[in-house]
Amino acid sequence: MPPKHNFMRKHISFFVFSCLFAQLVAAQSPAVVAIRDYSNKNAGTIINEFTGFLAIPNIAADTAGLQKTAAFIMDMMNKRGIKKVQLLNAVTPGVPPAVYGEVMVPGAKQTLIFYAHYDGQPVNPAQWAKELTPFIPKLFSQALDKGGMNISFPADGKYNNDWRIYARSASDDKAGVAAILNAYDALTKSGLTPGCNIKFFFEGEEEAGSPHLGEILQKHSALLQSDQWIMCDGPVHQSGKKQIAFGVRG
């Protein structure tokens, strides 16, 4: 089944806050309301940016596509006022770089790094439904396996929770990149201040097994000092509910 993105209103912003700003958000219902209101009011803008992101080819064999994808992410970060936005290259030449940025909060005692990856799996057209094209995002009334029909993106920016976007990496893992950055956007534009320093790290080789991730981490170890990493990638629970995994074996 091709990747799909679920338009649950809390998905793009709230699940990240439940990890990153637990001491801020969970204890203050007005903050939760403000974040949800922001996501609802700005859904059209958020999805327009996301579909533009999905339209950029990001498979490992397409070097130019990966470069454009990384540049798009840097633009997303710069527009949100994130500092020190840059590419982190490996020692090995020609390797897809990680995209980095940071927000340092005066007085913060902890630093968290949020991880997602911007590369996608190879595309096999034979495995895609006939009405789908990997890098042309399409909106459906519900999941295809539930009889979803292709519908137009709404001009009024109002989205139903049952709707789905289908495209390569709509879930794994451009959704992770977009969710993290829109969560930060919702936080700041709702007048809320993070309780910790935030660093952003978006990898470009995860689907290839991250063969040069160690090089990047070692080369840029000073910049990547932190207390914890939060990985915004992983399988969807069979219930469809959002989940936080605190560790895995191996």
Identify the residue ranges that each predicted region occupies:
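Acidic/His- and Gly-rich active-site-bordering loop/insert found
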Residues: 28-168, 189-194
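Bacterial Sec-dependent N-terminal signal peptides
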Residues: 1-30
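A generic structural signal for short, non-catalytic loop/turn and secondary-structure boundary residues
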Residues: 20, 107, 130, 193, ...
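Residues in and immediately flanking transmembrane alpha helices
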Residues: 22-23, 68-70, 130, 216, ...
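Acidic/histidine-rich catalytic neighborhood of metal-dependent amide-processing enzymes
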Residues: 156-248
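Short, intrinsically disordered, charge-balanced linker/junction segments flanking boundaries
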Residues: 4-6, 245-250
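Ubiquitous "structural anchor" signal
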Residues: 26, 135-138, 177, 184
